[in-house]
Structure formats: structure tokens, C-alpha cells
């Protein structure tokens, strides 16, 4: 299985920041950099940020005592029409940076192969057992208007 660290911080070579989810698959020596975005803003900045973190991942892995034989990169985007439109508007940029899509990414995560990959997939909000959205997410509440007589 995978061992994960959420918000893995780094300060290397004058660069500071954090990786949303840094993971390792001990059996294969793979390290995965997972950038999680609720939505996509600047496509170029997003890709450059993931590239920078992937470049620093072997150093971070070494400091954690992890063996690193390869780094895979994933961009995980919140499901939604706006996110899909923004990815589609910059399809060539995202396809070049993240060659694989959702099903292929999930398959690799379940059973990593010998080669590192890069992929983009959309993730829907968590659902509870009754099928509703996760209640831990803050709900929008509208104040009631005063009634007039």
C-alpha cells in the first residue's frame, strides 16, 4: 500500500512550500506528488508548481528515509463544470504535462508499474452513507427575511 503525508513542507535550495499529498509505495520505491486543487486558475502556474514539487520530491523522500526510484505526478481537481471547462480550455497544456486521465491514474495507483507516470483526474466531493454530500463541509445558510404584515 501507500504511505502518505498531507501538507509535506519543504525548504530546499531556497525554495519553500508544501506538497498537498506526498506518498510512497514502499514495495516499488515510487514516490507520488499529488497537487489537489478545488479549481484551476492559471494553467501554466499550476503545471510549473507541480513540476517544481516533483523535482524536490526525491530530496524530501531521502530526508524521510524513503527509497525513491521514481516520482509520479498527479493533479487532482475538484469535480465541477467550471473546473472541466478550464482544463478543456488549456487541454494541450494539461495533456502535455499530465499524459494520463482518471481511470488510468486510478489503475496505476492501485497497482504501480515500474515506470513513473503523470496524470490528471477529477475528484467528486465525498458522500456519506446515505448518498448525501459529506456533512462536515460547511453548508450555505441564508438569513430569513423579516415578514411584513
Describe the predicted segments one by one.
Residues 14-18:
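Short, flexible loop/turn motifs enriched in small residues
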Residues 46-64, 73, 89-90:
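Short, charged, amphipathic alpha-helix that recurs within catalytic cores of restriction-modification
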